[in-house]
Amino acid sequence: MKPSLIIVTFIVVFMTISCVAADDEQETWIEKRGDCLPHLKRCKENNDCCSKKCKRRGANPEKRCR
């Protein structure tokens, strides 16, 4: 085998592994962000909301994220 073929193969394998790892990180980020619905999620404490703001809304005594 030629040394250049080995180098090209190594580069292709490295790029493939890098792309797969980047896709996994992106999916994890999307899952974390998808769990946050600020105007719909009920909260008991300020840290339950993604925006860190928990206030009473409307006449209902329950609190929702703002």
Curated annotation (Swiss-Prot):
A GO MF term: toxin activity
Site (Essential for stimulation of [3H]ryanodine binding to RYR1) location in chain: 64, 66
Key words, A-Z: Calcium channel impairing toxin, Cleavage on pair of basic residues, Disulfide bond, Ion channel impairing toxin, Knottin, Neurotoxin, Ryanodine-sensitive calcium-release channel impairing toxin, Secreted, Signal, Toxin
Paired cysteines (S-S): 36-50, 43-54, 49-65
Spans annotated as Essential for stimulation of [3H]ryanodine binding to RYR1: 55-57
One GO term describing the cellular component: extracellular region
Subcellular location: Secreted
Tissues with expression: Expressed by the venom gland.
InterPro entries: Scorpion_calcine
Lineage: superkingdom: Eukaryota
Region forming the signal peptide: 1-22
Propeptide cleavage-removed residue intervals: 23-31
Domain notes for this protein: The presence of a 'disulfide through disulfide knot' structurally defines this protein as a knottin.
Family named by the database record: Belongs to the scorpion calcin family.
Function, as annotated: This toxin stabilizes ryanodine receptor 1 (RyR1) opening in a long-lasting subconductance state (40% of the full conductance state). Furthermore, it triggers calcium release from sarcoplasmic vesicles (64.2 nM are enough to induce a sharp release, and 50% of the total calcium is released after toxin (100 nM) addition) probably by acting as a cell-penetrating peptide (CPP). In addition, it has been shown to dose-dependently stimulate ryanodine binding to RyR1 (EC(50)=3.2 nM).
The protein's name in its UniProt record: Opicalcin-2
Species per Swiss-Prot/TrEMBL record: Opistophthalmus carinatus
